[in-house]
Amino acid sequence: MNIAEYILSVLKSQIFVLLSWGFHRPVRLENGLRFQVQGFIHRGTVEVVYVEGADLFEVRTLNADGSIKQKEEDVYLDCLVNVIDGMVERTPNYKERVEQEYKLSR
């Protein structure tokens, strides 16, 4: 299994969170994975890169021109989904945003 497949398997371990990002178009990178999202916080490209010497990950959201919008370094494997979720989807008023977006009533 290459690193892109490994990262994807970690993300899929929390499939409902992954789907909430509007995850699509995964692309293998030399040392990671790039994909598109349509979250409440970020719509566009996310890159997850394995930092081999540290055995950690770097997560980046990118602007449309490819420049780095936000970067989180030294991300442990077991925190990967949570860190990406905080950069892409989860807002302080997440429950209300979901209800509003999908016109759900209590």
Predicted regions: what they are:
Residues 65-106:
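Mixed-charge, Lys/Arg-enriched low-complexity segments
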Residues 42-46:
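Short, surface-exposed coil-to-beta transition loops
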Residues 39-41, 52-54:
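A generic beta-sheet turn/junction motif
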Residues 28, 50-52:
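Generic beta-strand structural signal
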Residues 1-40:
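Negatively charged, low-complexity tracts enriched in Asp/Glu with abundant Ser/Thr
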